[in-house]
Amino acid sequence: MSRPIIIDCDPGHDDAIALILACASPELDIKAVTTSAGNQTPEKTLHNALRILTLVGRTDIPVAGGALQPLSRELIIADNVHGETGLDGPVLPEPAFEPQPCHAVELMAKILTEATEPVTLVPTGPLTNIALLLATHRELHSQIDSIVLMGGSAEAGNWTPAAEFNIYVDPEAADIVFKSGIPITMCGLDVTHRAQIMDEDIEKIRKINNPVAQVTAELLDFFMIYHRDPKWGFEGAPLHDPCTIAWLLEPELFASINCWVGIETQGSHTLGMTVVDRYQLTDNPINTTVLFDVNRQGFVDLLAERLANY
């Protein structure tokens, strides 16, 4: 039995690779792809999701665009990381299909209503769409198996000293999600910064020599540019969003702890911080499985193995 999932994303190079990995994995039944603003503007992230699904031949998956901006803040985008299109680097096909004529939240609600078993939500961008779904469809919470998200950090941020980008873009949305009572797995910077892909890994992917692997290598070539800045101290580039899919496929590659996580929505220096109570210093109930380490080679091998399926 394959696991039913909905991917909510803001493509973005690493979102695109997460989509490619998921579509190559028969263990996952992708019920829908929804998009949010984040790495680029909402019209660009929607267009990019359609282009990636066209590339991998999955035009059967329903796609819908979601919120145009965060719940109560101005939109921040990461064009310094992902370029003008959001997927700068490779030449991608234009979409061979149209998005659904409805909002992302409406599409997710429809799928949850019709589902015969609980569905896993996999958000890899800001949590605006997920928060709107949870706030407006409380009757569907029981239809959600869990939320496996990329976001947050127990240590330092990557957009501010305290905050990771996805959470910082819409901290109020993240607050709703983490307070929802639905089981959460958090793939934050603690683990994704250990899930780095190196130059030699990219060359191995290029040598797989099918069209999807070629595009993946070219996506990674561009993604490397930003991460070569010495301030990060990286040997390669961290593949943030694919960690969510890899955890669903091979959780044994990861190490985790269970603890309470809260979202800072007020701090002048700490806005968007994920407060991780690793040592149970509060009485707050455990709400999150926090991933903090990964078998890097196993992770890269999984990606290469699935790319060969194309």
UniProtKB/Swiss-Prot annotation:
GO terms for molecular function: purine nucleosidase activity; uridine nucleosidase activity. The keyword Hydrolase applies. One of its GO terms (cellular component) is cytosol. Disulfide bonds: none annotated. It holds the Pfam family IU_nuc_hydro. The active site is at residue 240. GO terms for biological process: nucleobase-containing small molecule interconversion; purine nucleoside catabolic process; pyrimidine nucleobase metabolic process. Coiled coil: none annotated. InterPro entries: I/U_nuclsd_hydro_CS, Inosine/uridine_hydrolase_dom, IUNH, Pyrim_hydro_RihA, Ribo_hydro-like. Its EC number is 3.2.-.-. Keywords: Glycosidase, Hydrolase. CDD domains: nuc_hydro_IU_UC_XIUA. The keyword Ribonucleoprotein does not apply. It is an enzyme of class 3 (hydrolase). Hydrolyzes cytidine or uridine to ribose and cytosine or uracil, respectively. PANTHER family: INOSINE-URIDINE PREFERRING NUCLEOSIDE HYDROLASE, URIDINE NUCLEOSIDASE. Belongs to the IUNH family. RihA subfamily. This is Pyrimidine-specific ribonucleoside hydrolase RihA. The lineage of its organism: Bacteria, Pseudomonadati, Pseudomonadota, Gammaproteobacteria, Vibrionales.
